[in-house]
Amino acid sequence: MRLLWGLAWVFSFCASSLQKPRLLLFSPSVVNLGTPLSVGVQLLDAPPGQEVKGSVFLRNPKGGSCSPKKDFKLSSGDDFVLLSLEVPLEDVRSCGLFDLRRAPHIQLVAQSPWLRNTAFKATETQGVNLLFSSRRGHIFVQTDQPIYNPGQRVRYRVFALDQKMRPSTDFLTITVENSHGLRVLKKEIFTSTSIFQDAFTIPDISEPGTWKISARFSDGLESNRSTHFEVKKYVLPNFEVKITPWKPYILMVPSNSDEIQLDIQARYIYGKPVQGVAYTRFALMDEQGKRTFLRGLETQAKLVEGRTHISISKDQFQAALDKINIGVRDLEGLRLYAATAVIESPGGEMEEAELTSWRFVSSAFSLDLSRTKRHLVPGAHFLLQALVQEMSGSEASNVPVKVSATLVSGSDSQVLDIQQSTNGIGQVSISFPIPPTVTELRLLVSAGSLYPAIARLTVQAPPSRGTGFLSIEPLDPRSPSVGDTFILNLQPVGIPAPTFSHYYYMIISRGQIMAMGREPRKTVTSVSVLVDHQLAPSFYFVAYFYHQGHPVANSLLINIQSRDCEGKLQLKVDGAKEYRNADMMKLRIQTDSKALVALGAVDMALYAVGGRSHKPLDMSKVFEVINSYNVGCGPGGGDDALQVFQDAGLAFSDGDRLTQTREDLSCPKEKKSRQKRNVNFQKAVSEKLGQYSSPDAKRCCQDGMTKLPMKRTCEQRAARVPQQACREPFLSCCKFAEDLRRNQTRSQAHLARNNHNMLQEEDLIDEDDILVRTSFPENWLWRVEPVDSSKLLTVWLPDSMTTWEIHGVSLSKSKGLCVAKPTRVRVFRKFHLHLRLPISIRRFEQFELRPVLYNYLNDDVAVSVHVTPVEGLCLAGGGMMAQQVTVPAGSARPVAFSVVPTAAANVPLKVVARGVFDLGDAVSKILQIEKEGAIHREELVYNLDPLNNLGRTLEIPGSSDPNIVPDGDFSSLVRVTASEPLETMGSEGALSPGGVASLLRLPQGCAEQTMIYLAPTLTASNYLDRTEQWSKLSPETKDHAVDLIQKGYMRIQQFRKNDGSFGAWLHRDSSTWLTAFVLKILSLAQEQVGNSPEKLQETASWLLAQQLGDGSFHDPCPVIHRAMQGGLVGSDETVALTAFVVIALHHGLDVFQDDDAKQLKNRVEASITKANSFLGQKASAGLLGAHAAAITAYALTLTKASEDLRNVAHNSLMAMAEETGEHLYWGLVLGSQDKVVLRPTAPRSPTEPVPQAPALWIETTAYALLHLLLREGKGKMADKAASWLTHQGSFHGAFRSTQDTVVTLDALSAYWIASHTTEEKALNVTLSSMGRNGLKTHGLHLNNHQVKGLEEELKFSLGSTISVKVEGNSKGTLKILRTYNVLDMKNTTCQDLQIEVKVTGAVEYAWDANEDYEDYYDMPAADDPSVPLQPVTPLQLFEGRRSRRRREAPKVVEEQESRVQYTVCIWRNGKLGLSGMAIADITLLSGFHALRADLEKLTSLSDRYVSHFETDGPHVLLYFDSVPTTRECVGFGASQEVVVGLVQPSSAVLYDYYSPDHKCSVFYAAPTKSQLLATLCSGDVCQCAEGKCPRLLRSLERRVEDKDGYRMRFACYYPRVEYGFTVKVLREDGRAAFRLFESKITQVLHFRKDTMASIGQTRNFLSRASCRLRLEPNKEYLIMGMDGETSDNKGDPQYLLDSNTWIEEMPSEQMCKSTRHRAACFQLKDFLMEFSSRGCQV
């Protein structure tokens, strides 16, 4: 037996010694589509003179060539070659590679007869399997800024490059995903210039989060690259706060006695320091971001030159830890959280900053050994490469590094200790010899002396030593730079007598073999590598040789230091680095080749509000993308040659050996051990939150601790929490927080003693951003400039005073892509002013304009400040009176002006500050001035039919609403059209700039409302496509339609759930009805939006799960109470819902086109059949209401149900039809076809307006029309239904609400397509009306195919009768819109719904130096704020800062910020059935804005009170899921930004969204005895404001003596009155912003329009409440003036008392008897007799 084993060993040795000829095949292990593949072929051990010819190619493993063949020729003297093999898309597609279902692999094949004939192989091929990737080239995406507000426009660029980083022109696919990961936009484009630019708008309802823009080559699915940006609500800050710790870490070792120190810095965005006070608080933060307040560490400090320093001693910190039972050893892995709020003293604005990266560590350094090889070569040197960094991430230079190396040889070991310091970039490279017998190396590495960082690493020797090893040692272990020559030494190890003659090597970078070479073997063989840009940012050096027939290999990963681009791009601002706003700036762009340079400038304030987390494109990101093509894994080396090749990213075959087939592009992740955390930490950190383990329970607890902006007991709040599991922690934590508030004492002494005992409640709840206001651009210079070496760009800077960061990216055909280092430009004025205006204000309200002057000069500045005169504003001295102000050096000062607006318009308000030598500044902003009262709208529709003798002429009476504001802008807008389809579907209707959404005059907050952006536009596009009428509209209309559809699609995706369903709100459960609605619309929009069919298939699958056994569908969370629409509660609701889902599923069948979806499609079809059976049974019963009957008939007809079912449904529907003349409609039926709510009206006269039906009737009739069109086509019944619907449209083309509008436009579109004709018909309309200047006449000549002049919009006096004459052979429509402001809302429809708004709170304007802020620290009055004596409690600071959008701090010689509390109460009549959603629209008092934090509490907490809120200018919209039958109130705070006096009442409206006619409108006023009702103006400003006010004259005053005929001149010459009465005042009544004096006529002197005036009749006289005029009851007055435009509720004229009115108090008989007054009385009596009998004689 021993002999046999010996012979076997000798035989194997001899066999291995024979060096047989081989063909070696090398390639990257990944093939990229369209990118040439580098292939290395080598001939090994061939006899001299032998020549080998062959070719290489790619093929599908199943067969079929995937590339052209590439020939090669090798010989013993020329034994290797590097080939480039093309991988064309066409060949890959034709070979069937895309059809492979699993990870696609492709074979690299070398084919040569030599392999069969000489190498003794069975075939003439030799190959290796490669992983195929569709990734190719490089794509970079750039946005114009890192963070956006919802509703903002995002501009982006896509740079497309090939594998060599050169411009590529190709097809790209671009997608946008929202913060939920849902795709909201997809585009297929072709880049002709390699730079593609586009933009899209973020929906205004988007939730905060991170969005993503991705781009890929259309044929390369894996070439996807993306960039991220943040979406959240913010406004640019005026200044930025930074927290800088002295050390980026906190040592947690017991012996460390260092203080915790940090610096606070606050600077304006334009670079100047902020004066003010900093309030800082601290907490412990765990890995999940949960914070626990550290009591007793709160600090407040004065800023000096914008800076302050905070120091916490070890004892202070330890005391804070003791209070929460935390030891120092428990801190590892945690962070110390610091938050600072800075309040600046001049303007009182507050900004915040957080520090979240301050870690507790056991060492000051981090130690990284990832660059050290995991394989050692016994007998050679081992290279340990370590990177030492400070905890901040910066390189740690000159840090001692100690290495303890344990060399293990069997059971023996020896320890080697080495010490070396890091170089300038924190690197250390230590080389030490490894004895040949070593099998394992254990490394213990420490960095630093005191408290070192420690790392451990175990390195194994290869298991087999028979073939020896190859050692690769760099001559210089440091990383090379581009341009360096990198030298590596090669040496065989463990081979006593090497027989090979050459080393072979390869250089691999960017996923390709960049070079192959060989070097003759020497004792030490050196290889030189020239490092160029093509090798950056890293490359593998792989060397190998064959020994005894076995490959021996090693590799090394070399990182390149230089991160510069191949070309050159520099941005330089010529001249000064500091500019003034609106200056001209010269930007010099320098390149080293001809290139396109893409520019962009970003306001650096964006980084202060959260944009730092999304850094702009830079070269590090570029190299990261380039390096992603590196298919190698690890630092190099391996147990054997195959692993060396494989880990370097190579595939290899020598005929006998083969590397493993790669299965994935990514590398296997190294397993890391994780230190176990203290399980008891959370309980110790939070005494209350620690009681709950689940995240949901913790959130409920947090919600319970949050204080609401209105009073509710904890029990009341908990009752509103729907989930039982949430209710208990919510109630417990709510009571816990209430106890804290109840125990609070506001005394200063108590606070000083016990402040450390208060719980910082804010750390239990997420932080809110505090928003500030701005009106300046956030980015600009978004342009692409062609540059040839150099270009000087001249641009004008925006008006912002800030620091701009200018970015540049160049793209060159010769040098590729280069990202410039950003350059910054500071825009600043050393003297400037800041101006803030109210959102809006009403006429004759008074407000205080307070511009703040900033002086950063070294000297005091004396300036003159004035407001430029403008019509419509009353200003001091008419605007020419200036205030002389001295602003001390380095400080700020406010200046006050009182302003009274007198005109309802948008007025430019300009403030100018000017000093000597042209020193000064000017700011102009638009002041929005509104009319008094509330807006009222009234619409009328008339049918024009010249073929009807009775309808050829008609009289339209004027409006006589007694509540009209007397001197408003009264008019009636008249619109006439002869082409209803083009008006409704064209650029004035569904395709108007905002779509139908802008025409509805309703909000678009919830998911269903969002669909109004999409559905009507799709309908209109379909109509115009089918009738080929796009050419009749403007050329850009089609593009606008596509844009509207894209926006609607993007918006609705914000409501999608992960399972494909949709809910009315993001926080609300999914709705069957709404999900079906979305499925139907998005199925129709597939082509326009490029939606993924799989997503809609998920939606359809969710709907199928909602079907019950009887075929009906149920809705777990209804959006609308459909019982309202069917009649019978429950039964009809289910029928209508089922029919609705059937319609949606039928339209959704188009998304099941692929084979994978065939099974789901069959399920959908079966579901429709089952549902149709249910609908047929209900229709046969004959008990359906009109709406349920109509939608059922349409669903059965649409899905082609059995004829019997369709007939039953049709007959049931037609039995409920109401026919009036040429109109057919369906009203609301309660439960059977003979029980109608509203009996059909008798045929009306053509001269009467068309009655406007409720939304439900319109929707029902629309479904009936759709059914009739499918059943009978365009017949007589369809004509009548379409005619009725046509005349139900509003003035702007929409209907009542969303559903009736969507369905009706769908129905009318289908009808108009069926009835479309090219026949031209004409309509001539003449309109005439009497005006002040006589008869006004308009003649219109229209036809049914007009585009330009399609419709005319005319304006007539509101009270005038309009006469209409109609001629021609075409029918038409005349619509009238009356819009005016009303005095009060006493006669509104507040019978069904009720709303009440109350405003409470102290509103003070007194300049008080001892202001008390319960939400902040008290500050003494001084020019420079000092540290306050009395601190705020943690709970107060938390609640105070969460209740504001922006805080006005205590100001020097400035008013306290005014706050009020709004309480909104709603309820309804118990008999009223509502659709389920109501909206309260509250117009805020002038000068106020709602506190967003308060509104968010109403919507975001577990005890949700409001479903959603929106703010739009002065409006706050609150969405309620339902209106209770009992009074329910919500509250929120409002803050006054601008001081306003004589504040007028504002309006509030509560209405049913789906039936807006159900509404309640009320006025509410400011708090009584409030300073809001005080007069702010004085002197000439008040005189100007009262210039339009009437003046009361007294007959017995000498100046009124009529010796010179003063009264007669006033009456007959100027202004020449139109009426004259003597009246006795009966009473005075307040009407919004007016006072009404009801008076009885005692004598008629003169009249023009008031022909019915007689003694004893009453007339109303109105005066503005802002005027000082008072007419006393029971006194008699002479009043003469101009006729009014309005009437009272009896139809009698009412008169406005203004500056053109004569008002004289009549003397009593007793006074006229006195001798002193007798003459004056006679003169008055003579005037009355003469004027009444003779009038004016001119």
Curated annotation (Swiss-Prot):
Stretches assigned to the Anaphylatoxin-like domain: 700-734
Domain NTR residue range list: 1589-1736
Principal location: secreted
Keyword Ribosomal protein among record annotations: no
UniProt-annotated location(s): Secreted
Keyword Secreted applies: yes
Residue numbers marked as site, Cleavage: R753, N754
UniProt GO cellular component terms: axon; dendrite; extracellular space; synapse
GO biological process: complement activation; complement activation, classical pathway; immunoglobulin mediated immune response; inflammatory response; innate immune response
Propeptide feature ranges: 674-677, 1444-1447
Protein's name in the database: Complement C4-B
Organism: Mus musculus (Mouse)
